[in-house]
Structure formats: C-alpha cells, structure tokens
C-alpha cells in the first residue's frame, strides 16, 4: 500500500498533467478552426481545377502528343510514395493510420515485384518508416519551422516530385495523407497524382468546350499546377486532421486524468481514515491500560 505522502505526490503530479493536456486541447481547438477553414476554402478551387483538367484530358488522352504527366511513362514498375504526417506527436492515431496505409501499399507493391521509393513530409512518418525501409528513402521534407502551411510549401514539394519524374526516377507517384471529415473523423487517403487520374463523370461534363490553344499546350502548363494544387490540398487536409486528432486525444487524456485523480483521492481518503482510526485505537488501548 502506498504511503499517504506517495499518494499525495501522485495526485499532484496527475493534476499538473491534466493542466498540460487541457491547455494543449484548447490550443488545438484554436488551431483547428483556422486549419479547417483553410482546408474547406481550398476544396472548391481543387474541385474546379479537377473539372477543367477533366475537359482537357478527355480530348488529349488519346493523342500521341499527350503530356507525360497525363500519359505516364508507359510503365508501372517504379512507384514513389509521398507520405505526409505531422512534425509533432500527441495526436492519437493520426500518424500511425497514415503510416499503416502507406506500409500496406508498399508491401503490396513489393509483392508484385515493383520498385518503391519513399519521400516523407513530417518527422513522425519518417521515424516510423525509416526503421523498416530506410534504404527506400529518397528525401525528407522538414516543415517543423513552418507555422502556417502556404502554397509555397506545397509548390516546393511538388517541384521536387516533378523533378524526380523528369529525371526518370519513378513511373507513378501517390500521396498519402489524412482527409479531414470532422473533429473525430480523419480518413487515411491515398491519391495518385502522376500520371494524372481523371474521373469519368468530370471528363464528360467538361469535354463540350473547345480550347485555344490546343488541349496539349494548355495541359503542359496546367498539369504541374495541378500537382502543386493537389499537394497543397493534401497538406491543408492533413493540418486540419492533425489538430482535430490532437484535440480529441488531449480531451480524452484530460478526462482520464480526472478519473485517475478521483480514484487516487478515494484511495488517499480511505488510507488517511484508516490511519486515523488506527491512531484512535492505539490511544484508547493505551488509556485502558492505565
């Protein structure tokens, strides 16, 4: 049985921890609002970009002059996995869910005899994947000094992906990130960005237009922007998901700390009561002996 002093110290320690988790919950809630607004504001732009791209690619896809970002290399042998996680922990299963999805995809590709390389964004994903697949890493993007995700950050990542594609390092590139649904729901998502994937419904709706100059000329300019837009949207979705996951995790931690304080306080009171009762019995016994 722990002493009263030990119990009192432990109660104080848990109370201090609860203050920290409560403060982190409030900070995450404030950041979540801004991150959610940014992610939701970017969605219409990304959707419109996809619709424009659909109309252009519907006409250009069958052309011998179709850009490589659309037509691909003609092979499906080398894959680049771009895994986006957070720079900080204490976010529940946010990072592990993305890493799990990326790991499953990696194992599936390797089982098919494909060549896989990994580019990580965020320290936590790098830490988890490098233990097993360190030899597959081509680079790591550090965003620890970035206070607020901007398009410039996405463009830098997209430029590296495009440069590696132009250098013939891979045939297919896929983004792995968490899509923000709500505070308690973040969906691990895999999205292929190279070669471009166009939904049939979007293509049918936009293929009625004629474009000047021709579709291929416009695509040569828009496809790199489309990659950057998709990377930017993924970063924003990931940022909102991270804050939602951290807010939920810290709320649960605060509640658990409160429950532990209640249990420890009950044990402390019972131990204190038992100690007082024992002292009274000793006093009474001593008085009777006299």
Swiss-Prot record:
GO function terms (MF aspect): ATP binding; proton-transporting ATP synthase activity, rotational mechanism
Key words, A-Z: ATP synthesis, Cell inner membrane, Cell membrane, CF(1), Hydrogen ion transport, Ion transport, Membrane, Transport
Subcellular localization(s) per the UniProt record: Cell inner membrane
Membrane-related topology note: Peripheral membrane protein
Main location: membrane
Keyword Disulfide bond among UniProt keywords: no
A Pfam family assignment: ATP-synt
A biological-process GO annotation: proton motive force-driven plasma membrane ATP synthesis
Membrane among keywords: yes
InterPro entries on file: ATP_synth_F1_ATPase_gsu, ATP_synth_F1_gsu, ATP_synth_F1_gsu_CS
Tree of life domain: Bacteria
Gene Ontology CC annotations of this record: plasma membrane; proton-transporting ATP synthase complex
PANTHER family named in the record: ATP SYNTHASE GAMMA CHAIN (PTHR11693), ATP SYNTHASE SUBUNIT GAMMA, MITOCHONDRIAL (PTHR11693:SF22)
Role: Produces ATP from ADP in the presence of a proton gradient across the membrane. The gamma chain is believed to be important in regulating ATPase activity and the flow of protons through the CF(0) complex.
Assembly: F-type ATPases have 2 components, CF(1) - the catalytic core - and CF(0) - the membrane proton channel. CF(1) has five subunits: alpha(3), beta(3), gamma(1), delta(1), epsilon(1). CF(0) has three main subunits: a, b and c.
Family label: Belongs to the ATPase gamma chain family.
Protein name, entry field: ATP synthase gamma chain
Protein's organism: Paracoccus denitrificans (strain Pd 1222)
